Amino acid sequence: MTRLKAKYSPTKGKRKEDKHTKRMRKSSFTRTQKMLEVFNDNRSHFNKYESLAIDVEDDDTFGNLVLMENDKSDVDIPVIEEVTSSEDEQRAESSKRNNSLEDNQDFIAFSDSSEDETEQIKEDDDERSSFLLTDEHEVSKLTSQQSLNTESACNVEYPWIRNHCHSKQRRIADWLTSEIKDFVHYISPSKNEIKCRNRTIDKLRRAVKELWSDADLHVFGSFATDLYLPGSDIDCVVNSRNRDKEDRNYIYELARHLKNKGLAIRMEVIVKTRVPIIKFIEPQSQLHIDVSFERTNGLEAAKLIREWLRDSPGLRELVLIIKQFLHSRRLNNVHTGGLGGFTVICLVYSFLNMHPRIKSNDIDVLDNLGVLLIDFFELYGKNFGYDDVAISISDGYASYIPKSCWRTLEPSRSKFSLAIQDPGDPNNNISRGSFNMKDIKKAFAGAFELLVNKCWELNSATFKDRVGKSILGNVIKYRGQKRDFNDERDLVQNKAIIENERYHKRRTRIVQEDLFINDTEDLPVEEIYKLDEPAKKKQKAKKDKREGEIKKSAIPSPPPDFGVSRSKLKRKVKKTDQGSLLHQNNLSIDDLMGLSENDQESDQDQKGRDTPSGQDEKSPLETKTVDAQTRRDYWLSKGQAL
């Protein structure tokens, strides 16, 4: 125990540590000393040939090449002498005088003379000059290639300005307007894209008809209005004669049918929402498809939007710009609080419809798209009162209304929200799902600042500094595949628009919820619009019958025969008048009590049998007061008759 304590005492440990350190230093020093002794060893540098004598004649002998054909002494031996240069002789003499190896001057020269170096330098200069002095055609070709590369590098982020340079525009607003038109032409659908979408819709429609013969598939949304971006989805709706396809079982049945037919991949069925929907991708065209059920408001909205496009120039251009702006910032999805397509269209339409300079015909819309785009961002990014103001569009006219006056407005998540009345249903707020309005307003305000600052910057720049610049590129980003500037909508018919117009020609406006006209059958228009007259109600038929009886009783009786005495005639007329008065009184009582005519007739027959034949019937009008017992007996008899 004592040794252990001494071993682990601080002093012992310190002494042991110092001893170990000294040993390491000594060993390292010894190893280093042995390595340095190599340089002090003269034996490794001993010159073994120092004692040998150098013969001067060896140079001449060594320089001669002797060829011996045979050993005969009488044969002359030819000798070929190699002439050495003066520099070689001088080098040999210097080597004889000095031992370069001993003097540590045994370096190897890379060239024999400076003439070779000068010749090499001249050759390099000739090659460099020959490379620089190329043909003028090749120089211009290289310059043009470099300029094309520079232009392509500048147009990577702004492909719509390729071969469309507007930097020489004197007015910056005209530059922005031209750039907006170029962008719209750049993203407009080509002939192949329209054909691809038409084929996809035809395949889906045949599949729905194959599953349900009484149903049909219709297209609404951006594809039915020509307001879709490249690669945007297609909105469809399935309507049937019985209007029962919104049931969950039918939805899953259609989903299985499309998947078995190979028309859908990455399918998602959403049934626990207000509007059930099927989302999938068509594998051949890679287009996103959304299918809803038993809805007609989208088809009505598509027709209304096409009317707006015909009446409002510049609406399509601004809508496509705003859609791309929101798409690049991921603010176009309603499920995440963004703005939907119909909401954007209503915003732009109300903006153009209420712009003071447009209403006064002060400016042309198509020539001032740049200014209008900046005004749009300023209005909805800085000046619009989202807390108190709503937008109303009725009969093609837009207006602002206070939210307090919209009594049927559903309460939103926050007071700061966008409210737009549905043009087809004034009680519906089409923008109630856009709950992320704060970020959308910030995006609009930021776009306004970017456009204004860029316009000021390029307005003060020279034409040389404007080359390759873009104003719209500060707020619009397009990262899709390269496209051509071909707007080929006039070359191919859009079947979605044709089917929508045909649908509205066949369809009548639905008045009752339980009335649905099957517009899928190819019937004449006259038969579709022909409605059966509804059957008359029973009460109305009874009332008409009673009125006819009263009119008959009011008609005077035919003239009597001359053989009848006057007294009998008076008596007969008196009875007729009394019977008509009694009948009128009974009608009023029956109408008040709700008794039928059969009960009345049976009651009268019973009274007729009880009354003696010789007595005259007394009219109820002669009784001025009716006591309680009489009323009790009357109602008791009515109850027994029933």
Curated annotation (Swiss-Prot):
Q: Name one Pfam family in it.
A: PAP_assoc
Top-level division of the source organism's lineage: Eukaryota
In this UniProt entry, the residues modified to Phosphoserine are 596, 602
Q: Where does ATP bind?
A: 298, 323, 428, 432
- What EC number is given for this enzyme? 2.7.7.19
Region Disordered: list its residue ranges. 1-29, 84-104, 535-642
Query: Where is coiled-coil annotated?
Result: none
Q: Where is the composition biased (Polar residues)?
A: 578-588
The segment(s) forming the PAP-associated domain are 368-428
Print the keywords alphabetically.
Answer: ATP-binding, Cell cycle, Cell division, Magnesium, Manganese, Metal-binding, Mitosis, Nucleotide-binding, Nucleotidyltransferase, Nucleus, Phosphoprotein, Transferase
Q: Where does Mg(2+) bind?
A: 233, 235
Location(s) in or outside the cell: Nucleus, Nucleolus
Q: Where is the composition biased (Basic and acidic residues)?
A: 88-100, 604-635
Q: Please name the InterPro entries in this protein's record.
A: MTPAP-like_central, NT_sf, PAP_assoc, Trf4-like
Cofactor dependence is on:
Mg(2+); Mn(2+)
Q: Give the reaction(s) catalysed.
A: RNA(n) + ATP = RNA(n)-3'-adenine ribonucleotide + diphosphate
MF (Gene Ontology): ATP binding; metal ion binding; poly(A) RNA polymerase activity
Which GO terms of type biological process are on file?
A: cell division; histone mRNA catabolic process; nuclear polyadenylation-dependent CUT catabolic process; nuclear polyadenylation-dependent mRNA catabolic process; nuclear polyadenylation-dependent rRNA catabolic process; nuclear polyadenylation-dependent snoRNA catabolic process; nuclear polyadenylation-dependent snRNA catabolic process; poly(A)-dependent snoRNA 3'-end processing
If you read the UniProt record, what top EC class would you report for this enzyme, in one word?
transferase
What cellular-component terms does GO give this entry?
nucleolus; TRAMP complex
Q: What does this protein do?
A: Catalytic subunit of the TRAMP5 complex which has a poly(A) RNA polymerase activity and is involved in a post-transcriptional quality control mechanism limiting inappropriate expression of genetic information. Polyadenylation is required for the degradative activity of the exosome on several of its nuclear RNA substrates like cryptic transcripts generated by RNA polymerase II and III, or hypomethylated pre-tRNAi-Met. Polyadenylates RNA processing and degradation intermediates of snRNAs, snoRNAs and mRNAs that accumulate in strains lacking a functional exosome.
Q: What else is known?
A: Present with 2240 molecules/cell in log phase SD medium.
Self-association or partners: how does it assemble?
A: Component of the TRAMP5 complex composed of at least AIR1, MTR4 and TFR5. Interacts with POL2, DPB2 and DPB11.
Family according to the record = Belongs to the DNA polymerase type-B-like family.
Protein's name according to its UniProt entry: Poly(A) RNA polymerase protein 1
What species does this protein belong to?
Saccharomyces cerevisiae (strain ATCC 204508 / S288c)
Species lineage: Eukaryota, Fungi, Dikarya, Ascomycota, Saccharomycotina
Q: Which gene encodes it?
A: TRF5
